[in-house]
Amino acid sequence: MSARVCKTHRVYVGRDVRNFMDIPDLIEIQLRSYDTFLHGARNTPSGADTLISGTREELGLEDVFKTTFPIESSTGDMTLEYQSYSLDEKNIKFSEAECKQKGLTYAIPLKALVDLRFNNTGEIRRKDIYMGDIPKMTERGTFIINGAERVVVSQIHRSPGVVFSHEKDKEGREVFSSRIIPYRGSWLEFEIDQKKDLIYAKLDKKRRILGTVFLRALHYETREQIIEAFYAIEKTPVCQDRAEYELLTGKILARSVTVENEQGETRVLYKAGEKIHPHVIDDLLQNGICEVYIINLEAEGSLRSAVVINCLEREEMKFSKSGAQDELSREEALCIVYSALRPSDPMTMDAAEKDLQTMFFSPRRYDLGRVGRYKLNKKFRSDSPTTECTLTLDDIVNTMKFLIRMYSGDAQEDDIDHLGNRRIRSVGELMTNTLKTAFLRMERIAKERMSSKETETIKPQDLISIKPIMAAIKEFFGASQLSQFMDQVNPLAELTHKRRLNALGPGGLSRERAGFEVRDVHYTHYGRMCPIETPEGPNIGLIVSMANYARVNGYGFLEVPYVRVRDGVVTKEIEYLDAMDEDRYYIGQDSTAVGPDGVIRVDHVSCRHRGDYSTRSPKDIQYMDVSPKQIISVSASLIPFLEHDDANRALMGSNMQRQGVPLIFPEPPRVGTGMEEKCAYDSGVLVKAKQDGTVAYVSSEKIVVCSAAASGEEQEVVYPLLKYQRTNQDTCYHQRPIVHVGDRVQVGDALADGPATYRGELALGRNILVGFVPWNGYNYEDAILISHRVVKEDMFTSVHIKEFSTEVRETKLGSERMTNDIPNKSEKNLDNLDAEGIIRIGSKVRAGDVLIGKITPKSESETTPEFRLLNSIFGEKAKEVRDSSLRVPHGVEGTVIDVQRLRRSEGDDLNPGVSEVVKVLIATKRKLREGDKMAGRHGNKGIVARILPEEDMPYLDDGTPLDVCLNPLGVPSRMNIGQILESELGLAGLRLDEWYESPVFQSPSNEQIGEKLMQAGFPTNSKVMLRDGRTGDYFQNPVFVGVIYFMKLAHLVDDKMHARSTGPYSLVTQQPLGGKAQFGGQRLGEMEVWALEAYGAANTLQELLTIKSDDMHGRSKIYEAIVKGEASSPTGIPESFNVLVQELRGLALDFTIYDAKGKQIPLTERDEEMTNKIGSKF
């Protein structure tokens, strides 16, 4: 028997649409990116321990080493050369489980083989150097940093390359500009001044320079060279023929016309770039010139605008010496460029040359990156090698040409929100950038050490400091905006977090600066980014999710698969296209009728081309979508009937599924979409078989599978199961076996369920019987009325695990001790503690109970002879100690399920001054109760308002009571009709005992749902007569009844409810603190004061503003009065008033208060002293 038998059998209901491809691995973006970072593009078999430099493509770590090395000393006598690196898989110190328990980082040692070469003698000293620990990614695509699971979110940012834009400035003038954006280095911008018809260059956002002046600084030294770079040139005869004469008039000379005088000297008659007028032709003929070279503005490849010629004229007017015929020299052009870059610095020719050279043409200062080069090649259809990562003169000329073409209407501007201009930086690339910066610091230190160490004794390991590397890694994983605490509420939350794309973070956008356009849905998002799943707050549109089939290519651009169509026939070829390639094709919809032979059976196909939607003949389309669900993300594709929901509610539905708490008894949805299995499988919470075999042993703690080894003998593979583990969000991570002894399993089969999964499918909630009927106002405004049966049968009961820890420290007065002998505590309070003062596993605890008894030495006052006598008699006990026990905080109760101890004496790495850390895990069983938030998959959320006895709930004619009553007014205005269709199909499934698969955009029609309802014996509109549970009478009208999949969300009332009688006060204002975390009070704000004033409740108001808040004197007096049973004394002055007085005194305003009798009221101790002094004088 195969383990596959355990799976829920689903009946497909919906339109017959062909899916050409299965969904790829959903966390591939994380795994592949980090694997490339660690190993490069591997050419050797996986698992090879060391790879010799040269067998890896220069990506990731290899790129980091190659960029930094060789490191040469300042004198040039020694060089550090890198040979290869290795990852020491065998020496990983701790396993994933140990790292989580001990609060460590799961990492792998990195070693580099480095040569120290002495250039004078040729001697080489080689050493394999430890370069620090690199965090290792788990199989689930996460990192364990300081014991907590973290995810590095991929960043979407503006791609390096060239961008052409056309916008209006503040004065309303049109500005045509282009920017060459490198991966690292200075920006180069060009803009056209429409008023003057000139092109300017801007280097690093400094003062603008005339375009031709910049070109002259880049070795385009003559007018002829500049003109040839931009225009087509042709030779033309000069003659007196009238027709030829007129044709030549108005043309522009491409080359200067020179003549020789009688002495044999050559002089320029007309410069290149000058316009030919009739008198010029006469002059040429008189000087015996028969042919000239002119610019052909209409020729192919030539610019049609004379912008460059205008620049040459402007340059001559502005810079040529009076009366001189000479052109601007390169040296003069360099001076102009340098003065624009560094206006205050003294100018030297060498400095100007070097500055410009390093700015754009030095690999150390300027890097286009592989992506930038790829983008430039694609834009200008050039074939520069991808290794050419600096700018070339051709790049600069091509940029200027394209900008001028755009200005003259021959080229289109770029759309900066197009996904061809935005790319993904995944974890591998982010780590590469972090390490490059760290290695630069290491290089500086190595150079300093080279000049200070003795040559005879120096070794490679003496020169390399790994501190900057370790610090950078720690800072990146611990503090970077993109390294996030993993959202671990349920498997879907984990999966979605790993597929998230973030436009924020270093080098990205900021919430404040991001406008509407960058947040909006763009046509290139189709199949790449989900148009639905995004947060609702200020991050809307900036944090998005990858679509189901999308992948990131080698350049970081999102690609989407399409099936190839040739002559109206759909082939089996799958091709991935990025956004730039896709713009060239017509792409048909997947809903098109296609025969088994691949022939498209309709005359007109709905298709897309760029942002336009139209219908075309099947022969006109080149590609077709591979699946209807390729445009949305994982969360959205779990919502059945998604196409019937309003976009806002679909967004809420997909976001709220991630908040569903794993239940003790989960159930997969009766109406699913077929994505449940894939989602659970790729999330990493299931235990999967690593090889074929037979299940030999099953228990709650492990599964043993016997499989045939290569030698022919049977070998046992043990799969341990995780039990009651705490997640990042305090939910319970628990695995249960789903196979039985004797089952045959294949590689990849699910052996055990994880949290929120059932039989290998995602199960975030429960299917419950719902009626859309008002009930005494208890389901007003989205409130939910629920049956006690749901609570009684633990349908929505979940387990939550909290961790509390304490440290045993060495103090200056002696060490802290754990003990069950705590001063001033009765034996009854300490019953559950063992001999060492630690709570016993299995104990039930409530708020205030001691978990770990601990005492701390107090500072000893001057010891009297009596105290010394007592100390000598009773020893330690008489010493003054303070109770510093770990107690259960307010609002927490549960059962102690585990106690973990980390001791320095046993080799655990603890903080300085800490000898032991003890962690206590408390599990709480949370039943559904009033105030808990619940939601369906269609954005239909609400709060449980009342739990009604089962017998009072409305019931069907056969006696079945409803589980939930929802308000019917919650549907029309929200326009989430998907919940209505889901409940109809779910009701039929309940009666027929069927589980349905209805994929997104392939949903069944009303007729198909009606057929199922008829089979089940229900009316086709799903409306039935309900009886009132209290009276047994029918309701006046038929009620819509169905089965909806509901989830309990992580917003539980137990975590939010809070009350305070006594508690801490603020040190300055003496008012109670705020918030549950600080055990604060309720704030009486302005509006609450107004309300009490309106009712004239003067005494209540005075009490709330004084003794119940910050009247310190009044507080103690009222306590005394209550204890003694006396009448309450009058209130004093609130402390916040004293604070105000002190602030006014700080402004040098003398402020004194007097009572009704004219006597001064002291506000501070100093005031009191002054008053007493004055009183004593009189």
Curated annotation (Swiss-Prot):
Function: DNA-dependent RNA polymerase catalyzes the transcription of DNA into RNA using the four ribonucleoside triphosphates as substrates.
A GO cellular component annotation in the UniProt record: DNA-directed RNA polymerase complex
Catalysed reactions, as listed in the record: RNA(n) + a ribonucleoside 5'-triphosphate = RNA(n+1) + diphosphate
Keyword Signal carried by entry: no
CDD domains: RNA_pol_B_RPB2 (cd00653)
Keyword entries, A-Z: DNA-directed RNA polymerase, Nucleotidyltransferase, Transcription, Transferase
Example of a GO biological process term: DNA-templated transcription
Highest taxon of the lineage: Bacteria
Iron-sulfur keyword on record: no
Listed name of the protein: DNA-directed RNA polymerase subunit beta
One Pfam family per UniProt: RNA_pol_Rpb2_1
Top-level taxonomy: Bacteria, Pseudomonadati, Spirochaetota, Spirochaetia, Spirochaetales
Protein family per UniProt: Belongs to the RNA polymerase beta chain family.
Enzyme class: transferase
MF terms (GO), sorted A to Z: DNA binding; DNA-directed RNA polymerase activity; ribonucleoside binding
Subunit-structure text: The RNAP catalytic core consists of 2 alpha, 1 beta, 1 beta' and 1 omega subunit. When a sigma factor is associated with the core the holoenzyme is formed, which can initiate transcription.
EC number(s) given by UniProt: 2.7.7.6
